[in-house]
């Protein structure tokens, strides 16, 4: 085991604080509508330009191990806020740095770190309660657009795209963000359920111009196994032919005799049919087939349930108003499933999302949820250069998470105003001793920093602006740094999602309190350079040897 270096007390906290400040200073320049960009060097390709706090934080690694520990702890604040609310990472970083800075001063002055921590925890509880109390539900599409615009750094076009997307696919629907091939940003909405499997054979195509299958009022057979023998299918096919409606077969695979017969019947015109491979793999495939069955009001045919193919009746088939299948995707619109069944399935998937610990599983479950709940919207972000597209895509991602958070927990006045107002409530908190009172005071001071930093980034005097905002009693009164005017933030459309503000203060205080209570730090000693690896002139790679 290699030797370690240990730092104690003031020395440890000073090093840590330096790291916190370096990271916070790099991140805080991006805050607010007049925040600046940060350029990140990439080991390959062009540098990346971003205004996203968490992206900047993730790039920072410091040479000094002890400074780096401080920076990494605060980076965790930004990451946690991004995971929980998807936005507010810069606010969280600014808050954490402010709490650590004031806390370190108090500890150096001889106060008890554990009492300071208890005071900080008390203050955060009171702040969260105040935020929740003053939170307003999002009622209109216009408010969703405003949240998106603020989070996308004042880009109204992005705000509008997001509110349109949420209007079309619902609050639970999936909105994905991709890079466009053109200059324009566009919105593409897929209604109903879409999965990434196309037709098994091109002979099923009904619309030759678009090379796709289009069926109206179709039956859907959902089968878990491969279909290779036609005999077991015949009774069902005859029943479907008599109804005159088309049939879509979703199965693990359709091959051999079964596929050949379906194609021949399709070409002769007697049977409108198309076959598609089932989406997903393994257990996920079973779950997705069950989703399709619930959406279309059918039954997933599975030998586990003791249902054999030859016993399948028309009543077991799903139905949909429209089915479209191209080479790569199948879309089912207006399935005939019962609303109550679909809602129960949605609730079940939501419960699984809450329980899962894997990010990959969570993403897949959210996709399934969206397909059941409404549809999928794709925002394709355009721009003149790849660097511009990437920077804009970062902002669209932030804005998308912010609008989701706003729908979930409501909205508050933006521009750091909600935290400023909450700081006034902290004057009334009863504490057990003076050190705890100082802990509350540390949070109270820190809460003014987001509003102050937004003003500083806009070239204003932060202290003057915070003072003027607090002079007025009106809750949503604040400073619009874009226009340089004071007024009602909500009426001006400057609003933040409650969830984002709440996550920012909770995560910032959690990590900052841990940093304040740190008394020792341990890191590996830097490796001493040995001569063996060098290449001095004429050494031929044998560094340190005399010739």
Curated annotation (Swiss-Prot):
It is found in: Cytoplasm. Coiled coil: none annotated. Gene3D superfamilies: GroEL (3.50.7.10), GroEL-like equatorial domain (1.10.560.10), TCP-1-like chaperonin intermediate domain (3.30.260.10). Keywords: ATP-binding, Chaperone, Cytoplasm, Isomerase, Nucleotide-binding. PROSITE patterns: CHAPERONINS_CPN60. One of its GO terms (molecular function) is isomerase activity. It comes from the Bacteria. Its EC number is 5.6.1.7. CDD domains: GroEL. GO terms for cellular component: cytoplasm. The keyword Transmembrane helix does not apply. SUPFAM superfamilies: GroEL apical domain-like, GroEL equatorial domain-like, GroEL-intermediate domain like. ATP binds at residues 30-33, 51, 87-91, 415, 496. Forms a cylinder of 14 subunits composed of two heptameric rings stacked back-to-back. Interacts with the co-chaperonin GroES. Belongs to the chaperonin (HSP60) family. Together with its co-chaperonin GroES, plays an essential role in assisting protein folding. The GroEL-GroES system forms a nano-cage that allows encapsulation of the non-native substrate proteins and provides a physical environment optimized to promote and accelerate protein folding. This is Chaperonin GroEL 1. It comes from Rhodopseudomonas palustris (strain BisB18).
């Amino acid at each position: 085991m290699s030797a370690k270096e240990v730092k104690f007390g003031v020395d440890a906290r000073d090093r840590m604080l330096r790291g916190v400040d370096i990271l916070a200073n790099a991140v805080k320049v991006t805050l607010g509508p007049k925040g600046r960009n940060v350029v990140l060097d990439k080991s390959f390709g062009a540098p990346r330009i971003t205004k996203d706090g968490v992206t900047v934080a993730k790039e920072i690694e410091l040479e000094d191990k002890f400074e780096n520990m401080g920076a990494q702890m605060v980076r965790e604040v930004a990451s946690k806020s991004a995971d929980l609310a998807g936005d507010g990472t810069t606010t969280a970083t600014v808050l954490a740095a402010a709490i650590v800075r004031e806390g370190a001063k108090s500890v150096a002055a001889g106060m008890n770190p554990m009492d300071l921590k208890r005071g900080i925890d008390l203050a955060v509880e009171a702040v969260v309660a105040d935020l929740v109390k003053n939170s307003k539900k999002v009622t209109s599409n216009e408010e969703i657009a405003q949240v998106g615009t603020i989070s996308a750094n004042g880009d109204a076009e992005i705000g509008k795209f997001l509110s349109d997307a949420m209007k079309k696919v619902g609050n639970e629907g999936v909105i994905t963000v991709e890079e466009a091939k053109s200059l324009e940003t566009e919105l593409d909405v897929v209604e109903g359920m879409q999965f990434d499997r196309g037709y098994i054979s091109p002979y099923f195509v009904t619309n030759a111009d678009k090379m796709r299958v289009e069926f109206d009022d179709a039956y859907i057979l959902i089968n878990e196994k491969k279909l290779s023998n036609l005999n077991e299918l015949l009774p069902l096919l005859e029943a479907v032919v008599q109804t005159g409606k088309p049939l879509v077969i979703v199965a693990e695979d359709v091959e051999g005799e079964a596929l050949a017969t379906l194609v021949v019947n399709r070409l002769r015109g007697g049977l409108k049919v198309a076959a598609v491979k089932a989406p997903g793999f393994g257990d996920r495939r079973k779950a997705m087939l069950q989703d399709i069955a619930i959406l279309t009001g059918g039954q997933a045919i599975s030998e586990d349930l003791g249902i054999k193919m030859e016993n399948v009746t028309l009543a077991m088939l799903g139905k949909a108003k429209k089915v479209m299948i191209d080479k790569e995707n199948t879309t089912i619109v207006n399935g005939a499933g019962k609303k109550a069944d679909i809602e129960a399935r949605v609730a079940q998937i939501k419960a699984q999302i809450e329980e899962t610990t894997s990010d990959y599983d969570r993403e897949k479950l959210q996709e399934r949820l969206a397909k059941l709940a409404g549809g999928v919207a794709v925002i394709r972000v355009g721009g003149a250069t790849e660097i511009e597209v990437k920077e804009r895509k970062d902002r669209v991602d932030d804005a998308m998470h912010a609008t989701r958070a706003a729908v979930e927990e409501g909205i508050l006045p933006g521009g750091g105003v909600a935290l400023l107002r909450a700081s006034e409530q902290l004057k009334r908190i009863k504490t057990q001793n003076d050190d705890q009172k100082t802990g509350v005071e540390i949070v109270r001071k820190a809460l003014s920093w987001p509003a102050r930093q937004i003003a500083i980034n806009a070239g204003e005097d932060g202290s003057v602006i915070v003072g003027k905002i607090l002079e007025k009693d009106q809750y949503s009164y604040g400073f619009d740094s874009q226009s340089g005017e004071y007024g009602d933030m909500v009426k001006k459309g400057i609003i933040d999602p409650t969830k984002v503000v709440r996550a920012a203060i909770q995560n910032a205080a959690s990590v900052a309190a841990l940093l304040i209570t740190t008394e020792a730090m341990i890191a590996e000693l830097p490796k001493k350079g040995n001569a063996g690896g060098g290449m001095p002139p004429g050494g031929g790679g044998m560094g340190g040897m005399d010739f």
